[in-house]
Amino acid sequence: IKEMKLENLAARNVSELSGGERQKIAIARAMAQEPGMIVFDEPTGNLDLANEELIIQEAKKLAREKNIAILSSLHDLNQALYFGDRFFFLKDGKIKYAGGEEIITSDVINDVFDVNMKIITLDNKKIIIQGD
């Protein structure tokens, strides 16, 4: 509870918690078990932006400290860039691209998602935006 900054929720009844608060507790419970790997499906889907960033930062920190691998499915590619260090892109149910951040190019994104996107760099970070 303390590591995920959830002390303010400890005394509350579960029925009083919002969906986002329940999501944060579920993630904290999974991390507390110190498994070898955790699988997240849209781990920040019910969270506001402030809590989304907190969860990502704390999950990354705990994963490093406790040597836990995190496998996460995300539809927000910018969040994936922030969260991950290895990436797998599926197309037609098969892994089409795999690797580190270097595989994330406009060509790969446009191929996998059939959209016109481009990647820009801002403050040494890749950001995916709608293409022209």
Predicted segments, located by residue:
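Conserved ABC ATPase signature
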Residues: 13-17, 21
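ABC ATPase nucleotide-binding domains
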Residues: 102, 106, 112-132
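Conserved catalytic motifs of ABC-family nucleotide-binding domains
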Residues: 34
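Catalytic Walker B motif of ABC-type/P-loop ATPase nucleotide-binding domains
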Residues: 38-41
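Conserved ABC ATPase "signature" region
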Residues: 1-9
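Conserved switch/coupling elements of ABC/ABC-like ATPase nucleotide-binding domains
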Residues: 88, 92-97, 102-103
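Hydrophobic anchor residue at the start of the ABC signature
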Residues: 27
